[in-house]
């Protein structure tokens, strides 16, 4: 068992998405990508819609996820992430993601949209693009 482990807990409105020991988690904050390991400094960070990388204990394989945003609470031995949506790369339905994006793009073309609706639709497009990019692109940032 690795001594360099930290607990990662990811929760969504549906419950626990991930709850296990990891060596490192890489996620994108408003300041850019950060890697979090055991003995990290305490931090609360806003997570941008992006790829999230999970390196489990004694594994060379990365788990890659599409996260729609959220908040990370980081301390010395634990990382807690709260998000409204996250899914593993292999679970992303690419056609559904593309169709969802097309629907939102059509809504965005309607005249007389309020500023808040435009912002809401743009965020939904950003999240859809993230899911599409995570599914299509290589396993890098």
Curated annotation (Swiss-Prot):
Membrane topology: Peripheral membrane protein
Any GO MF annotation of the entry: ATP binding
One Gene Ontology cellular component annotation held by this UniProt entry: plasma membrane
Subcellular location: Cell membrane
Entry keywords, A to Z: ATP synthesis, Cell membrane, CF(1), Hydrogen ion transport, Ion transport, Membrane, Transport
Pfam families, sorted: ATP-synt_DE_N
TM segment ranges: none
Function (record text): Produces ATP from ADP in the presence of a proton gradient across the membrane.
Subunit and interaction comment: F-type ATPases have 2 components, CF(1) - the catalytic core - and CF(0) - the membrane proton channel. CF(1) has five subunits: alpha(3), beta(3), gamma(1), delta(1), epsilon(1). CF(0) has three main subunits: a, b and c.
Similarity-based family: Belongs to the ATPase epsilon chain family.
NCBIfam families membership: ATP_synt_epsi
Protein name per the record: ATP synthase epsilon chain
Source organism of the structure: Mycoplasma mobile (strain ATCC 43663 / 163K / NCTC 11711) (Mesomycoplasma mobile)
Encoding gene (name): atpC
């Amino acid at each position: 068992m690795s001594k360099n482990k930290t607990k990662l807990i990811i929760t969504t409105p549906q419950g626990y998405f991930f709850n296990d020991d990891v060596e490192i988690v890489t996620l994108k904050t408003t300041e850019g990508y950060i890697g979090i390991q055991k003995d990290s400094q305490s931090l609360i960070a806003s997570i941008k819609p992006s790829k999230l990388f999970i390196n489990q204990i004694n594994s060379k394989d990365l788990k890659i996820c599409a996260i729609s945003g959220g908040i990370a609470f980081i301390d010395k031995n634990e990382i807690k992430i709260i998000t409204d949506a996250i899914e593993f790369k292999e679970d992303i339905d690419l056609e559904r993601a593309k169709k969802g994006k097309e629907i939102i793009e059509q809504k965005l073309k309607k005249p007389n949209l309020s500023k808040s609706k435009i912002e809401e639709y743009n965020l939904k497009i950003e999240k859809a693009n993230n899911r599409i990019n995570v599914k299509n692109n290589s396993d890098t940032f």
